[in-house]
């Protein structure tokens, strides 16, 4: 391990202190419908105390929950999941955040994974039954509903991003990768690797839940659905020659060739075979820099500095790749990337006094942005740093 990436005991404590102190600044309560926000029944964590104050974002919350359960804030984490159950029951979808004008847009679904994090601590089976029922509704009423105007399931049982406005730009917002060169400004035309991995994980999580509930018929139905998705994804998205998963342009019946960290989601979802994983790990060098992983490979397409392209590295994608590597036994690679990202955060905290939404992983500065000023704070960064410190703590080999 490069000495520049070693986290000292003081650095460890400085990061923990900052994160623990910041939770209170971003804990929000918004119980009533008011102005642009609709009310939520439980307190929640917003991304920061800046432009995202009072917003509970969907995909942000998964990574935030990872940190909350590791800082003994289980009731807050459970309340955030309960807020999503409330949204699903009220609106028949989980919007990207708790604002009226976002009711036609969701985000990559992570609710079953949030439920698993909370249940692992509480063991509350009654609560899990209620929560998993909401995820089943979300899957059938939004992501797999062929009767919606904004149809997501479009080709061979696979889904795309598509919000109420049915525009490429709005679909890219639903992806959470706003903006990126991944979709070549035609997001509606693509079956994304990450979205379909998330839906595959819903199906396998629901299959396991029903198996544990002694309901084999329901379990088998979701398992069949998951296996069908896995076969379709392998057929359309896996490039045997390149050894990587790519988004699929179903309008032109063409597999993409643009490398992004979305291609590692099959490791996180445990969809890839071990032979595929071995080939995928060889591509880490395309993305790896001193501060961790860039969201995309450095190519001419991404020289516009779209915020989800090279040279930016986003904390959620670091975690997805690290967890995926751990799932398949690539512990040394996971450790190396984790140390790079922790070291980057430690250095930026020392220099700026804050952690940030995203980073330029080449220079080690807060990330490039063309949409809004890069935000400090930051809930998912803090949570993922906390998770990494716990996972690779001194007792575990940090």
Language model features by range: what are they?
Residues 112, 119, 200, 206-207, ...:
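Heptad-repeat amphipathic alpha-helical coiled-coil interaction surface used
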């Amino acid at each position: 391990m490069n000495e520049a990436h070693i986290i000292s005991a003081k650095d460890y404590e400085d990061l923990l202190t900052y994160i623990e102190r910041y939770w209170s600044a971003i804990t929000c309560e918004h119980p009533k419908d008011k102005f642009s926000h609709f009310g939520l029944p439980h307190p929640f964590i917003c991304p920061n105390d800046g432009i995202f104050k009072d917003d509970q974002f969907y995909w942000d919350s998964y990574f935030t929950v990872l940190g909350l359960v590791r800082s003994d804030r289980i009731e807050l984490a459970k309340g955030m999941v309960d807020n999503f159950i409330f949204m699903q029951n009220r609106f028949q979808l989980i919007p990207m955040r708790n604002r009226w004008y976002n009711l036609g847009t969701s985000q990559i679904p992570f609710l079953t994974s949030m439920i698993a994090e909370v249940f692992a601590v509480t063991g509350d089976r009654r609560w899990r039954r209620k929560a998993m029922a909401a995820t089943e509704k979300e899957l059938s009423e939004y992501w797999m509903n062929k009767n919606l105007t904004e149809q997501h399931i479009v080709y061979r049982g696979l889904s795309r991003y598509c919000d109420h406005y049915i525009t490429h730009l709005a679909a890219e917002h639903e992806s959470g990768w706003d903006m990126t060169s991944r979709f070549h400004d035609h997001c509606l035309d693509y079956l994304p690797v990450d979205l379909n991995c998330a839906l595959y994980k819903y199906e396998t999580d629901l299959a396991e839940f029903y198996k544990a509930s002694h309901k084999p018929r329901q379990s088998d139905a979701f398992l069949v659905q998951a296996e069908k998705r896995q076969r379709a994804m392998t057929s359309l998205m896996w490039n045997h020659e390149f050894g990587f998963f790519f988004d699929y342009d179903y309008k032109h019946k063409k597999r993409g060739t643009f490398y992004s960290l979305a291609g590692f989601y099959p490791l996180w979802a445990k969809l890839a075979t071990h032979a595929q994983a071995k080939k995928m790990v060889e591509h880490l060098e395309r993305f790896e820099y001193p501060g961790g992983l860039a969201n995309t490979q450095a190519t001419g397409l991404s020289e516009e500095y779209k915020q989800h392209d090279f040279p930016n590295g986003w904390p959620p994608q670091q975690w997805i790749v690290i967890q995926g590597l751990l799932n398949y036994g690539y512990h040394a690679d996971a450790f190396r990337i984790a140390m790079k990202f922790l070291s980057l955060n430690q250095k930026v905290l020392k220099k700026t006094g804050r952690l940030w939404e995203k980073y330029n992983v080449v220079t080690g500065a807060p990330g490039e942005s063309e949409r809004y000023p890069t935000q400090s704070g930051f809930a998912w960064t803090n949570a993922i740093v906390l998770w990494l410190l716990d996972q690779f703590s001194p007792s575990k080999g940090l």
